């Protein structure tokens, strides 16, 4: 039976060649029946935020004669904390909402037994996505409505029939924007490791036009398509130590908000102009991407601005040109690469793509071949690192709000969140020996696991360089010896002289630099006389300015696409992105000796420079752009007056005044505790001494009952007392001792009984019941009355007389049916 079960399992995992193609877009494929591996048992009632899809899932499927085991984890970082969706309601009004229960079915992972493998799939309605093994990229999608266990097609990208696509960013425009590149700049990186810098984050906003909505048919289908695409893009960028987080989705289900032209350059300019007008109304983001169902002219499938990330021009347009979402995901990753400063691989001599030529090209190839790319080339990584050195890229260092990521903190998502000391990804992908990937806690003996000031699981010593100086307006940063992260990036003090200008927030703005940024390398600042013009909307020029802080005037270069210009003589003014005004001279630009443009006027440097800031740094540092001391290596902030080693040593022991405060606080607490204890004890003592009712032998009711009812045999019987009252033995020759008490008796003591010959009185029989507790008096117990006429001491017993006096004992208790007590 077991052999039959294994045979059936093997039959399920082996692929079956389909007798016919399900659609004409696929040239060759294999039919597989994925088998989901049983996961660990969980409670039936899952928390609501976990949704219907598990955090982890594994599938076994067969393709190309092999059985592949895919281990997947839900991409909890796919959606940002403030993720919103915008669409048009039935009444025509625009609706923006944050969906509740943002659970999804998009996963990332790896293939068991294959190093450097990758997988990105959705499990919403069957399996759809890709998994990479070595240089082979396998695509999978369902063939029927059988769900995850139904028939699926597995094929390689080159077997998907599609037209070749190209990037609309021309090589000429790239060359003019990026300048010449040599092979020496792009030496191959040793190994295939991630960059050692901190993780960068792209907060993405996606717009879907009406043509795409009509093609997919519903808002739900659009949402699913976009999440699939972004999930793939995020997976592609993870190898560059980047994360792509979707913070907003806008679906034009009614009509387009601007004209989507078949000309991709026009559509891009319309997108950026619309974004500039709507930016304050939309979720804050770093990059906007349009996905359109419009067929662009020629072979172009994407168009983007180069090196525009973190600016108002940060965006791109993408044609949804493939039935498989991996196709548009690769296009979006390519265009986003242009936004990050990357050039086409073909334009760089010596650029190396680690992919085999027959397996496909890298992501930044100028055209898409028969297979989808899956990695970035060496030169693309070098371009990226160069872009990240610019002050412009600062927006990428801002991580999303980790405390509000959709799904909450999850160990293994590469985000160090609440309750975690480190996060190196899932156990199968983690290569960081300083971090326990299953608990996201530091390994035993490790001080750190991440950060540029962390080396071999230890924090680097104070004074080691962790961020070098990039240019004249930058400052180098050093490790402080206590934290694994490099201190915040700081710049020279605003107003510090630099090449042809003065530093301002880490840049050296000059007129020539600004003209080159807009008009390309050939752009130059126009003659000084041009700056005396003020250009009003509609290209109305008026000559009355007395400084050079009005409209930016340039000459030479190439006119930017989608921008209108105003030409006055040899002066060229460029319209802003929204077309409502003309580009001004940026703040901080030099307008004369010791003068800069500030709030539209040419003013003295002292408008933002403190004359005595650096004097506070004790000659061991300089003032930075925040008017704070930036200390030299080994010196401690805030005023660079002490060495870091001295500060760290002093921090190991508490200051004297802190010790004094702690001692005084301890004394006060002990005193208060003593007062409280004393008051409680005193109150208990007083409560016991509040006039207790005295129980005396003379007031014992049993005494009176015995004396009045039954005379004692031959003398007075000892009065009955409670079990806790002891009366000392009194001899006849001793006087009776009265109790030392100030309480006066209200009635005289009873007269001694007369000796009568009578049978002994019966002793009452009591049930076994606990005697009633009485308060023990604080004075001596009473002495029983002495028999009158007592003779000499110690008389011998005589007939009819009682024996010596003994302490009063409680009545003898007998069980029912017992005989009468015998005389003692």
From Swiss-Prot:
**Pro residues composition-biased segments:** 747-756
Region annotated Disordered sits at: 710-756, 776-824
What quaternary structure, including any partners, is listed in this protein's UniProt entry? Answer: Interacts with FST3.
GO molecular-function terms, A-Z? calcium ion binding; cell adhesion molecule binding; immunoglobulin receptor binding; metalloendopeptidase activity; metallopeptidase activity; serine-type endopeptidase activity; tumor necrosis factor receptor superfamily binding; zinc ion binding
Question: Residue ranges of the Peptidase M12B domain?
Answer: 200-400
Q: Corresponding gene?
A: ADAM8
Protein residues bound to Zn(2+) = 334, 338, 344
Which residue ranges are assigned to the Cytoplasmic compartment in the record's topology? 677-824
Main subcellular localization, coarse class? membrane
- Organism equals Homo sapiens
Task: Give the protein's recorded name.
Answer: Disintegrin and metalloproteinase domain-containing protein 8
**For this UniProt entry, what's an example GO CC term?**
plasma membrane
According to UniProt, the tissues expressing it are described as: Expressed on neutrophils and monocytes.
Q: Which GO terms describe its biological process?
A: angiogenesis; canonical NF-kappaB signal transduction; cell morphogenesis; cell-cell adhesion; cellular response to hypoxia; extracellular matrix disassembly; inflammatory response; leukocyte migration involved in inflammatory response
Location of the protein in the cell: Membrane
Which cofactors?
A: Zn(2+)
Q: Which segments cross the bilayer?
A: 656-676
**At which residues is glycosylation annotated?**
67, 91, 436, 612
Function description: Possible involvement in extravasation of leukocytes.
Q: Where is the Disintegrin domain?
A: 408-494
